[in-house]
């Protein structure tokens, strides 16, 4: 005869969703298309981080972005939540997150798709 004896009992709690929390000190959040268009015109060097709060790779890029912001003070960094501002994401043809759109002298000149810190830094150096 077999007897079942529980080895350990533990309460199971539902997972709480992890929200994107910015630790950036010099980053602006884009909220509308007019603001986006003005931002492009006003900045010599620009990086737009398209992200979603539920995107794991976006969260993984946060520490790398913080370092890049500190390393390149002459570059303007902004972020755009694709769920809150789908019109801006559509304007930049964003289809995956994270996507980083690079701008220079009032023009959008490049796009880096995916969590690739090396490619992002190379793109910033080339601005």
Swiss-Prot record:
Positions of the record's site feature: Contributes to redox potential value: 56-57
Gene Ontology CC: mitochondrion
Keyword flag Transport: yes
Positions in coiled-coil regions: none
Top-level division of the source organism's lineage: Eukaryota
GO process terms (BP): cellular response to oxidative stress
Keywords, comma-separated and alphabetical: Disulfide bond, Electron transport, Mitochondrion, Redox-active center, Transit peptide, Transport
A Pfam family it matches: Thioredoxin
Record PANTHER family: THIOREDOXIN, THIOREDOXIN-1-RELATED
Note, other: Yeast has two cytoplasmic thioredoxins, TRX1 and TRX2, and one mitochondrial, TRX3.
Protein's name in the database: Thioredoxin-3, mitochondrial
Encoding gene per record: TRX3
